[in-house]
């Protein structure tokens, strides 16, 4: 509840605060959810699933379709990386981290958010320019896969990174 003071006498009125704004922990939870969801999709493809695999296109699709030990190891490594990112985001919810541990946690999450925003943002921008016909790549373009990347897969990374950056900023603000 927020308090609003009206008039010279200081009459106080309590206004409800929207839960979405009041809960400063939602960005960390949302970032973790996006990380775990991304890891789940990658795990599905790593274990041989093919649903929506054609929307990825290019080398990632080829690697996932190979079903070799190397492709499994690569997929498993990506899953571990995404799960680790989700756990790091959840660690922002904890109260125990202080001093060097807290700085390391904030640095790791901050670095991850920058990487996600840069990767997702650049991919959305460049892919969008190609789809709009403003940039012509040297090779052939899988327009179907590119549309999925611009409007879903790469946008997912961009949103995940932006929400993670918000979680880091809120953790920094809460500690000061």
Question: Whereabouts are the PLM-identified features?
Answer:
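Hydrophobic cores of alpha-helical transmembrane segments in multi-pass inner/ER membrane proteins
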Residues: 77-87, 151-167
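Transmembrane helix-loop junctions in multipass membrane proteins, especially transporters and channels
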Residues: 47-54, 94-97, 128-135, 169-176
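C-terminal TM-helix exit segments that contain a strictly Trp-centered aromatic cap at the helix terminus
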Residues: 37-49, 114-131
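Alpha-helical transmembrane segments
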Residues: 28-39
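Individual transmembrane alpha-helices with interfacial aromatic-anchor signatures
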Residues: 73, 108, 141-160
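Hydrophobic transmembrane helix segments
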Residues: 38-73
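Cytoplasmic juxtamembrane regions at transmembrane-helix boundaries
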Residues: 2-24, 88-113, 173-176
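Interfacial non-cytosolic loop connecting adjacent transmembrane helices
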Residues: 59-61, 123-149
């Amino acid at each position: 509840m927020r308090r609003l003071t009206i008039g010279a006498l200081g009459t106080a009125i309590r206004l409800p605060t929207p839960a979405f704004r009041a809960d400063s922990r939602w960005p960390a939870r949302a970032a973790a959810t996006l990380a775990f969801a991304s890891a789940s999709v990658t795990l599905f493809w790593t274990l041989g699933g093919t649903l929506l695999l054609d929307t990825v296109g290019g080398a990632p699709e080829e690697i996932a379709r190979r079903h070799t030990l190397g492709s499994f190891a690569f997929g498993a490594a990506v899953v571990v990386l995404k799960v680790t990112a989700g756990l790091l985001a959840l660690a922002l919810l904890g109260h125990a981290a202080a001093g060097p541990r807290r700085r390391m946690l904030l640095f790791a999450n901050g670095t991850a958010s920058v990487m996600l925003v840069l990767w997702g943002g650049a991919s959305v921008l460049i892919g969008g320019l190609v789809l709009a016909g403003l940039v012509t790549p040297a090779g052939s373009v899988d327009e179907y896969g590119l549309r999925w990347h611009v409007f879903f897969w790469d946008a997912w990374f961009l949103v995940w990174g932006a929400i993670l950056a918000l979680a880091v900023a809120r953790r920094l603000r809460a500690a000061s």
